[in-house]
């Protein structure tokens, strides 16, 4: 196609565009309310797109959750929950009788700290009660991009006193700073892991969404740590590498807890999980 024909096509497109703009202007002039409706719909579409991009897509959300479908995975016998101040005051007597798919609760993961200064307001109570009621308990630290890895690690160690029979310490990491390279971010995460590992002589558990791990914690060194995968409302784990725990829903219901609670399963037997605990690890890797 030569330049003359291209020029004619461009001129024709311009004339058609002007006609369309003129027709749209006439329509809006005759019906001013249409402008409000058009603008409102555009803003709503933008809002939905932004919400999906930043909150839905990264976590693998499934719309069935809106209907309260906890979607219990089949074939697993060791069930547990993770809790924080969001669950409020827990009635542990009632919780002790709670069952998931006919199986009793075996373990409880408890939020302890966040960043370099925050302590969950229900941590001490939940941590003591979990041991008192016979659950295998664990404590997790919620990673913050606003504090150094070293300060966060020592904040966790100064707050949490894990004992023999407890699960290894847990690092919950879900966000990478936008202004930091993947290599620097991985170095920070490893700093936290190494400091805490030196204290307890066990490898901490890493909790995160599987897409986040594949994108930001994909270095082989992270495969040496037990993985607690967050992957909601699916029938099976899509992550191909080994994992220990699976948080499969955030809309679980149990007696003794008001509102929703996260449900988890352990990938193995109760005996296997006991071997994972502090003071009982003998070649579990």
Label every PLM stretch briefly.
Residues 66-87, 218, 222-285:
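Functionally critical loop-and-helix segments that line ligand-binding/catalytic clefts
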Residues 59-68, 72-91, 96-193, 197-199:
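Substrate-binding cleft of extracellular glycoside hydrolase catalytic domains
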Residues 152-163, 182-195, 212-221, 246-262:
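Short secondary-structure transition/capping segments
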Residues 17-28, 51, 55-66:
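Short helical patches
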Residues 1-32:
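N-terminal Lys/Arg-rich, disordered targeting/topogenic segments
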Residues 33-56:
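Hydrophobic membrane-insertion alpha-helices, especially the h-region
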Residues 168-240:
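Catalytic domains of cell-wall/extracellular-matrix polysaccharide-remodeling enzymes
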Residues 117, 146, 213, 236, ...:
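Flexible, glycine-rich phosphate/dinucleotide-binding loops
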């Amino acid at each position: 196609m030569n330049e003359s024909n291209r020029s004619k096509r461009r001129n024709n497109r311009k004339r058609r565009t002007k006609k369309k703009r003129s027709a749209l202007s006439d329509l809006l002039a005759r019906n001013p309310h249409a402008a409000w409706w058009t603008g409102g719909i555009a803003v709503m579409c933008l809002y939905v797109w932004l919400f999906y991009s930043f909150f839905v897509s990264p976590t693998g959300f499934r719309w069935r959750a809106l209907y309260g479908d906890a979607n219990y995975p089949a074939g697993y016998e060791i069930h547990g929950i993770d809790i924080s101040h969001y669950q409020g005051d827990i009635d542990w007597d009632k919780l002790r009788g709670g069952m998931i798919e006919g199986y009793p609760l075996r373990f409880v993961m408890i939020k302890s700290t966040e960043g370099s200064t925050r302590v969950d307001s229900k941590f001490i109570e939940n941590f003591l009660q979990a041991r008192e009621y016979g659950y295998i308990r664990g404590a997790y630290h919620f990673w913050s991009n606003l504090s150094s890895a070293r300060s966060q690690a020592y904040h966790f160690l100064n707050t949490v006193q894990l004992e023999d029979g407890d699960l290894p310490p847990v690092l919950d990491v879900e966000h990478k700073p936008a202004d930091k390279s993947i290599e620097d971010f991985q170095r920070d995460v490893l700093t936290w892991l190494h400091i805490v590992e030196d204290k307890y002589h066990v490898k901490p558990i890493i909790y995160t969404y599987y897409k986040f791990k594949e994108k930001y914690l994909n270095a082989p060194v992270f495969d040496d740590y037990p993985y607690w995968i967050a992957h909601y409302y699916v029938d099976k784990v899509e992550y191909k590498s080994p994992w220990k725990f699976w948080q499969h829903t955030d809309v679980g219901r149990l007696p003794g807890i008001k509102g929703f609670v996260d449900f988890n399963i352990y990938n193995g037997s109760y005996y296997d999980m006991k071997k994972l605990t502090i003071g009982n690890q003998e070649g579990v890797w």
